[in-house]
Regions:
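Carbohydrate-active catalytic/glycan-binding domains of CAZyme proteins
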Residues: 18-245
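Bacterial N-terminal signal peptides
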Residues: 9-15
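Bacterial N-terminal signal peptides that target proteins for export
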Residues: 1-8
């Protein structure tokens, strides 16, 4: 959630969408700093060469700062697009949610108060949405800092993040918030993909100094337990990852 170096770093999830005619395109969601303008799209025919779709497609209305950072989207089997995003740097106890049938016209925006039972929570950062095709429900994972909750590392208490999650079928009734992953260090920007049945991969950012790099963990179940985090597979100062299973 530090200032992003480039547009690609702002990606929260890569998804495949049909963009008219009979041709399929890769698309991803993005945003521009200072993140108060709203949702943007980029598209590609091959997943390697990208161009922007002009315009802002959803202006943020929620939260203390009314931001749209880290937009993450998934398409369900019925063709509906479901979007979640970060609404504020600090102070909000939830993330934003909206849905659309065509990526143009969006539902009313809702705040999903996932940390309402933890009033000392500093933030709710980078929610990532995953559709569980086996359970036919959504899972959203995000990073929050609850001061004093975990052993203090080299980061200050208000920057000591861990990864949490909820599940829901409709974003009207949500599960109890649970801890997804404690790797023993401050971590953010987790994204999960399913490689096969009982085979899940989670990539996350080690948000401690001087690391600030990406690591990977594995699990037999979507909700874990996940393996210890790997050694970094990127240079330092990398975040905002995107994954797609090809």
């Amino acid at each position: 959630m530090r200032k992003l170096r480039n547009t690609l770093a702002a990606i929260s999830i890569l998804f495949l969408a049909s963009c008219g005619g009979n041709k399929d395109y890769y698309m991803f969601t993005s945003f521009h700093e200072p993140a108060n303008e709203g949702l943007r799209y980029l598209y590609s025919e091959d997943g390697m060469h990208w161009d922007s779709v002009p315009g802002v497609w959803l202006k943020p209305e929620l939260g203390q700062h009314q931001l749209m950072r880290d937009p993450s989207m998934v398409r369900t089997p019925d063709g509906t697009y479901h979007l979640v995003w970060t609404t504020s740097w600090k102070g909000d106890l939830g993330f934003g949610y909206a849905y659309s049938k065509d990526l143009i016209h969006w539902s009313e925006q809702q705040m999903i108060p996932v940390m309402a039972n933890e009033p000392t929570t500093v933030n709710v950062w980078a929610p990532e949405i995953f559709y569980d095709d086996e359970a036919e429900q959504f899972m959203v994972v995000w990073a929050s800092c609850v001061p004093g909750r975990f052993e203090k590392g080299i980061e200050e208490e208000k920057n000591n993040h861990r990864l949490y999650y909820i599940t829901t079928k409709d974003f009207k009734t949500i599960s109890e918030t649970k801890l997804l992953y404690d790797p023993g260090f401050s971590s953010i920007d987790a994204t999960i993909i399913k490689r096969a049945k009982n085979d899940y991969v989670m990539v996350l950012k080690d948000n401690t100094r001087p690391e600030r790099n990406l690591k990977v963990a594995f699990a037999d179940s979507l909700t874990g337990p996940y393996s210890p985090a790997s050694q970094p597979f990127t240079e330092s100062f990398v975040e905002g990852l995107s994954l797609i299973h090809i």
